[in-house]
């Protein structure tokens, strides 16, 4: 059972903030190796020099802007700096040059399970370095120490209507955390621009620590009748374990779910900077809004049906397919259902991607996880996902209206949560929201360290476009 932060008679969400002194002498992973903040501090001068070198080429051309870019949501425009990851249309995502398989091999794992820790991924995203096991254990403990939410946030969540959308609750709670923003207070008092990154870092770590607690409390209130969370934060455990425990999935009997959560959170943490949640966080942060307000904007973007709701839509569609086709279905039955979906004017959820033109490596990582566990591989719902992943691409190619007919990560993630008993599809995006904090918050720290300016693109009306391009 988890180690209590205070008496077990008090609910986690209603605790008053503990001082650092309360934990003096309890850090179990003290090490001579630099912690995350010290590692970042050492990396900043070199990155600032790199920025100077890039600025020396300010008059060079990066690419062209076509009408289709301006009308098509700015797709394909190289218009923002994003350090943690690069997305290639054919190779998929790379984190500081490392593939997902590289990260699974190199990044430290939890005390149980075999999957990489999301906090190790955050370390990599922020510093470009692979942390040692001791460095990650120390960082995990720091996140656990800072996981409790202020009493007023807990009361606010308790007072929300139980059927208020989880993402609305999530965004409001994160936004309200700016009451304790170190950056906002330091900026108001006067702060050297070169030092903006430090209170921003502190806020980002505080927010990362609290995201699982907020998300778990929303789940408890909406789907489990409210009251205290099933477990309090265990100072000796990692970020994902504590999230799982607060969702009611702690202990040795739930190790597979805890490992799935580690993989899911690490995979969904960053996917370049142009997606809505990442870009919204960067955009709002560029006005020097604190990390809490900035990421609240990212969460509200994530709540949009075109961004963060795909996993639940896939699951609903798969279950509808399962009910519509025979119990002993054939590949032709699946093929026919796919065509019926397309011919009715709907899309096949979980297929295609704004950038990728090959199968999503994140999808493949989750499928590999499932294939290695017979209890998932034999799940009829999962088997239908696997069958679709082989049949749907050929159907979509024949249909001819998609640039990428391959499955994306959403094809499998919701189904895996469903397998482990989480059937509340409306909540899936909140889990995504816990994960997505990793990349945008890491970049927000670099935005402050590099002194990147407020985002201010030029807009143009339709008549202006026509006047400019007619006669070309």
UniProtKB/Swiss-Prot annotation:
It is an enzyme of class 2 (transferase). It comes from the Eukaryota. CoA binds at residues 75, 193, 306, 348, 350-351, 402-403, 408. One of its GO terms (molecular function) is citrate (Si)-synthase activity. Keywords: Acyltransferase, Mitochondrion, Transferase, Transit peptide. It is found in: Mitochondrion matrix. Optimum temperature is 49-54 degrees Celsius. The active site is at residues 307, 353, 410. Its main location: mitochondrion. GO terms for cellular component: mitochondrial matrix. Residues 1-29 form a transit peptide. Pathway: Organic acid metabolism; propanoate degradation. Belongs to the citrate synthase family. PANTHER family: CITRATE SYNTHASE (PTHR11739), CITRATE SYNTHASE 3, MITOCHONDRIAL (PTHR11739:SF15). Component of the methylcitrate cycle that catalyzes the synthesis of (2S,3S)-2-methylcitrate from propionyl-CoA and oxaloacetate. Plays an important role in detoxification of propionyl-CoA, an inhibitor of both primary and secondary metabolism. Also has citrate synthase activity using as substrates acetyl-CoA and oxaloacetate. Homodimer. This is 2-methylcitrate synthase, mitochondrial. It comes from Gibberella moniliformis. The lineage of its organism: Eukaryota, Fungi, Dikarya, Ascomycota, Pezizomycotina.
């Amino acid at each position: 059972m988890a180690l209590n932060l205070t008496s077990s008679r008090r609910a986690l969400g209603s605790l008053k903030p503990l001082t650092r002194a309360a934990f003096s002498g309890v850090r179990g992973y003290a090490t001579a190796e630099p912690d995350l903040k010290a590692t970042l501090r050492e990396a900043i001068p070199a990155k600032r020099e790199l920025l100077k070198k890039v600025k020396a080429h300010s008059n060079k051309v990066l690419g062209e802007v076509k009408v289709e870019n301006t009308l098509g949501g700015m797709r394909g425009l190289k218009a923002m700096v994003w350090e943690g990851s690069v997305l290639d249309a054919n190779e998929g995502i790379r984190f500081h040059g490392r593939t997902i398989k590289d990260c699974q091999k190199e990044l430290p794992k939890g005390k149980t399970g075999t999957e990489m820790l999301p906090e190790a991924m955050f370390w990599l995203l922020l510093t470009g370095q692979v942390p040692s096991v001791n460095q990650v254990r120390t960082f995990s403990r720091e996140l656990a120490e800072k996981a409790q939410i202020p009493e007023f946030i807990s009361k606010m969540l308790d007072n929300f209507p139980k059927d208020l959308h989880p993402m609305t609750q999530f965004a409001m709670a994160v936004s309200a955390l700016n009451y304790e923003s170190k950056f906002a207070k330091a900026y108001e008092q006067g702060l050297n621009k070169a030092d903006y990154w430090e209170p921003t870092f502190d806020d980002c770590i505080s927010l990362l620590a609290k995201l699982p607690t907020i998300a778990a409390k929303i789940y408890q209130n909406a789907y489990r009748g409210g009251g205290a969370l099933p477990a309090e934060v265990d100072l000796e455990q990692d970020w994902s374990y504590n999230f799982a425990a607060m969702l009611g999935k702690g202990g040795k009997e739930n190790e597979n779910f805890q490992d799935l959560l580690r993989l899911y959170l690490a995979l969904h943490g960053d996917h370049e900077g142009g997606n809505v949640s990442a870009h919204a966080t960067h955009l709002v942060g560029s006005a020097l809004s604190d990390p809490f307000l900035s990421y609240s904007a990212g969460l509200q973007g994530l709540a949009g049906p075109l961004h963060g709701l795909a996993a639940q839509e896939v699951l609903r569609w798969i279950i509808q397919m399962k009910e519509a086709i025979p119990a002993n279905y054939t590949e032709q039955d699946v093929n026919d259902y796919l065509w019926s979906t397309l011919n009715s004017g709907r899309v096949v959820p979980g297929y295609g991607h704004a950038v990728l033109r090959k199968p999503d490596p994140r999808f493949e990582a989750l499928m590999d996880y499932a294939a290695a566990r017979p209890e998932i591989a034999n799940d009829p719902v999962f088997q239908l996902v696997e069958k679709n992943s082989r049949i749907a691409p050929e159907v979509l190619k024949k249909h001819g209206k998609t640039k990428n007919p391959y499955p994306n990560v959403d094809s499998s993630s919701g189904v895996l949560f469903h397998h482990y008993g989480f059937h509340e599809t409306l909540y899936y995006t909140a889990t995504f929201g816990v994960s997505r904090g990793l990349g945008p918050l890491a970049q927000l720290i670099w935005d402050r360290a590099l002194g990147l300016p407020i985002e201010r693109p030029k807009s143009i009306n339709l008549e202006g476009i026509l006047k400019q391009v007619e006669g070309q």
